[in-house]
Amino acid sequence: MATYAVGDLQGCLEPLKCLLDRVAFDPAKDRLWLVGDVVNRGPESLETLRYLYSLRDSLVCVLGNHDLHLLAASNTIERLKKGDTLREILEAPDRAELLDWLRRQKIMHYDQGRNMALVHAGIPPQWTLKKALKCAAEVESALADDTLYTAYLDGMYGNDPVKWDNDLTGVARLRVITNYFTRMRFCTAEGKLDLKSKEGADTALPGYKPWFAHKERKTRDTKIVFGHWAALEGKCDEPGVFALDTGCVWGGAMTLMNIDTGERYSCQCESPLPVTLPATAKP
């Protein structure tokens, strides 16, 4: 039995199949971890979601910002933006089944035996592992609760609050938790977010660093697997932190990692977008 983690799919199914063939993935015994952003911008968002659903008993998936955007658009079609490739999902006959499965996926997964966490974007440096799991569970509960679901999705958009406060309540509290787990790249040691900077790790504004680079980070004793940040090109010098988004949808590659051995595999992607992997302008 082997367990693999794969970077952002973003609706690119063929590179995923290439990788699973490369390692002779057997869903009867192997397991696949997904860092989120499984849909959007790529050419096969619907096919990708259906394929993952068929493997649902063999995978662990955390939600990314594009996945949450799909759920929000399923409630409010006006949320769709130019460049989204989500409409085919919303018009699919099996839409309800697929979206119900997606909304019940995790915001954060923690494997106690491996002492390894799986998130889409990261964990803010001021949070302990226990705090991060507790906050992730708050968003997961809102997604699973029919009375909170729509209000949460309608209220999750926006950059404020820029920093965590234990006294936050309601939608504002859930929004900053969501932004930490699904949109974060740079922040201060206290967790103040810069959500506008999207380039490489060495381009932080004064007072900011990549979330994983703060010396005071309280999850330094936990291994963390994440995606989201394509400009890192899968490179992270921080021990125990594994970046897996290598910009497939931008014409880069898709990367798969054996989480026990650290061995990586990649399959090249043909970008469906009009530009190749830039340092800027990623979601």
From Swiss-Prot:
It comes from Pseudomonas fluorescens (strain SBW25). Keywords: Hydrolase. It catalyses: P(1),P(4)-bis(5'-adenosyl) tetraphosphate + H2O = 2 ADP + 2 H(+). It holds the Pfam family Metallophos. Gene3D superfamilies: 3.60.21.10. SUPFAM superfamilies: Metallo-dependent phosphatases (SSF56300). This is Bis(5'-nucleosyl)-tetraphosphatase, symmetrical. Hydrolyzes diadenosine 5',5'''-P1,P4-tetraphosphate to yield ADP. CDD domains: MPP_ApaH (cd07422). Belongs to the Ap4A hydrolase family. Its EC number is 3.6.1.41. One of its GO terms (molecular function) is bis(5'-nucleosyl)-tetraphosphatase (symmetrical) activity.
